[in-house]
Structure formats: C-alpha cells, structure tokens
C-alpha cells in the first residue's frame, strides 16, 4: 500500500514537472538516473522554500544504499507500527520513518 502511495505521488510530481498527462511505468522507475535527478531536484527546490529558512540545510543527493534500504522497508511495512531504529540505521546514521 505504501508503495502505491509513493508511486502515485511520484506520478503526480513527474506529470506536473514534465507537462504531460500520459506516463509509462518506466517513466516512474527510480532506478533511472534521470528520474533520480528529477526527484532530488524537486525535493531540493521545495526545501529551499521553507520559511523560516534553515541555517545549515545541506543539499540532498541520491544514495543507492539508502534507496535500497527504503525499498526493503516499504516492502515489509506495517502501517500500524514503526520499524525499530536498528532497522533504520545506515552507516551509523538513523533514518526517519513516517507512517500515515
């Protein structure tokens, strides 16, 4: 279910940014470097508009290890409970989780 929400969100973003109303599934694949760049650029654009502005907001970039971890987490997602922090730690850094 969470993957469906993710794909629908990505489809809406990509549809708006490309100015098209028809997309193939291949146009949404996050394994495509062009799609990765489009997602990252849109995310960084949105982050720049926060008010008040962040004092030390770093530019976000694509990370294949984190992307793969997020994919695994989404596949085993239980929307009623959070994943333990140990399951959301990559390279010693904890990753956030949002369940809605």
UniProtKB/Swiss-Prot annotation:
Q: In which tissues is it expressed?
A: Expressed by the venom gland.
Q: Which InterPro entries match?
A: CAP_dom, CAP_sf
Q: Is the keyword Amino-acid biosynthesis assigned to this protein?
A: no
Q: Which UniProt keywords apply?
A: Calcium channel impairing toxin, Disulfide bond, Ion channel impairing toxin, Neurotoxin, Potassium channel impairing toxin, Secreted, Signal, Toxin
Q: Which Gene3D superfamilies match?
A: CAP
Please give the positions of the paired cysteines in each disulfide bond.
Answer: none
Identify the main location.
secreted
Question: Domain named SCP: which ranges?
Answer: 41-81
Kindly indicate whether the keyword Disulfide bond belongs to this entry: yes
Enumerate the subcellular locations listed in this protein's record, separating them with semicolons.
Secreted
Pfam families recorded: CAP
Signal peptide positions on this chain:
1-22
Q: What exactly does this protein do? A: Blocks ryanodine receptors, and potassium channels.
Similarity remark: Belongs to the CRISP family.
Name this polypeptide is given: Cysteine-rich venom protein VAR1
Species whose genome carries this gene: Varanus acanthurus (Ridge-tailed monitor)
């Amino acid at each position: 279910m969470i993957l469906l929400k993710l794909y629908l969100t990505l489809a809406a973003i990509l549809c708006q940014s490309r100015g098209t109303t028809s997309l193939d599934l291949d146009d949404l694949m996050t394994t495509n470097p062009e799609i990765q760049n489009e997602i990252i650029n849109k995310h960084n654009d949105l982050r720049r508009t926060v008010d008040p502005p962040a004092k030390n907001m770093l530019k976000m970039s694509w990370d294949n290890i984190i992307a793969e971890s997020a994919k695994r987490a989404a596949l085993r997602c239980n929307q009623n409970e959070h994943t333990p922090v140990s399951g959301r730690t990559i390279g010693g850094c904890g990753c956030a989780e949002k369940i809605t």
